[in-house]
Amino acid sequence: MSESTYSLFQLGKAHLERGMAAQATVALEKAKKREPDKASIREALGIAYFRIRNWDAAESEFRAVLELAPTDDYAHYALGRALEQQGRAAEANGHYKLASTMRPDAEHYAERIRDLD
């Protein structure tokens, strides 16, 4: 019996919650192959790649989320973090500003802008 996409997603999220990001990427990559247009899977995979410091892969996943959901404030913030880790502060700041505009109550978004301005 094969695992459902949802069970793979849940397994990946559980691994993330336990601090096992590398294991999370395995389950989440399988889920992504089945449903590549599912933003929740792509976001969780981006988080997993970010936690294992695979900045390029994290960037790619957060960009995919934004293609699927352009107004996802967290995806803009997370993409900014991945870009910042790659030394692309100006590009990161643009995404922090978008995230902060979309969700002005999220102080941590505004803090990243102040840190880079």
Show which residues each predicted segment covers:
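Structural marker of alpha-solenoid helical repeat scaffolds
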Residues: 34, 68, 85, 101-102
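Alpha-helical segment of the N-proximal tetratricopeptide repeat
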Residues: 2-34
